[in-house]
Amino acid sequence: MTNFTVIIPARYASTRLPGKPLAEIAGKPMIAHVFEKAMQSGAKRVIVATDHEQVATVARGFGAEVCMTSETHQSGTERLAEVVEKLGIAEDEIIVNIQGDEPLIPPAIVRQVAENLAKYQVKMASLAVNITDPEELFNPNAVKVLTDHAGYVLYFSRAPIPWHRDQFASLPKEKSTRGQLVLSDHYLRHIGIYAYRAGFIKQYIQWQPSVLEQIESLEQLRVLWYGEKIHVELAREVPPVGVDTAEDLEKVRSILEK
């Protein structure tokens, strides 16, 4: 059995939904739902990493271990690195990063991503799902991932990759035809859940941001830029929507309040 620790970055000052970790869903704050899913995964330890005392107080109230972090971090990975350093987590410990806005994340895939890292000689592991809806393929908010035959990542992009030259040739002029496209299994949507060793998190933040990650606004591209490997598996369960907007929050409420 793979041992792993889950860290949940829970930033209070969300641009689109301020106070998001504390948003009430089915009688509980969102962060409580995420914590419960993480606990159900079989993680040996689950830590809420936050920059806000109110989030910390609420999390402690439902029994979570909390690590207070800086308000100045530019990414969730930087926040994880502070937790690893503050708590003295061993360098070979597997860390799974679950975003604090994923109250519906299936516990099975939390364990799956940890096992994925343990199985392969890579610095980072993640998950993906097949894209069957052409509109999702062309949506820049849905991050696409392209892998080789063994699941090692070639690239992440907000663009539709790979670009099927013949199949997509008419799309710029006839966008209405997108719904008629039949997509192959090569098209994958990346799920934003990661596993890495604690020591690699500290290495990652020493690297300067890469040109590609700045262009795409995808921090995982830094790993590829510096020549390291990421392995991606198909998720055993397709995770429902995360919460980025007020509309997403209402969708999740309707699911959990049934």
From Swiss-Prot:
The keyword Transcription regulation does not apply. Pathway: Nucleotide-sugar biosynthesis; CMP-3-deoxy-D-manno-octulosonate biosynthesis; CMP-3-deoxy-D-manno-octulosonate from 3-deoxy-D-manno-octulosonate and CTP: step 1/1; Bacterial outer membrane biogenesis; lipopolysaccharide biosynthesis. Belongs to the KdsB family. The keyword Nucleotidyltransferase applies. GO terms for cellular component: cytosol. One of its GO terms (biological process) is lipopolysaccharide biosynthetic process. InterPro entries: Cytidylyl_trans (IPR003329), KdsB (IPR004528), Nucleotide-diphossugar_trans (IPR029044). It holds the Pfam family CTP_transf_3. Its EC number is 2.7.7.38. Coiled coil: none annotated. It is an enzyme of class 2 (transferase). This is 3-deoxy-manno-octulosonate cytidylyltransferase. Keywords: Cytoplasm, Lipopolysaccharide biosynthesis, Nucleotidyltransferase, Transferase. SUPFAM superfamilies: Nucleotide-diphospho-sugar transferases (SSF53448). Gene3D superfamilies: Spore Coat Polysaccharide Biosynthesis Protein SpsA, Chain A. It comes from Pasteurella multocida (strain Pm70). The gene is kdsB. Activates KDO (a required 8-carbon sugar) for incorporation into bacterial lipopolysaccharide in Gram-negative bacteria. HAMAP family: KdsB (MF_00057). It is found in: Cytoplasm. Disulfide bonds: none annotated. PANTHER family: 3-DEOXY-MANNO-OCTULOSONATE CYTIDYLYLTRANSFERASE, 3-DEOXY-MANNO-OCTULOSONATE CYTIDYLYLTRANSFERASE, MITOCHONDRIAL. One of its GO terms (molecular function) is 3-deoxy-manno-octulosonate cytidylyltransferase activity. It catalyses: 3-deoxy-alpha-D-manno-oct-2-ulosonate + CTP = CMP-3-deoxy-beta-D-manno-octulosonate + diphosphate.
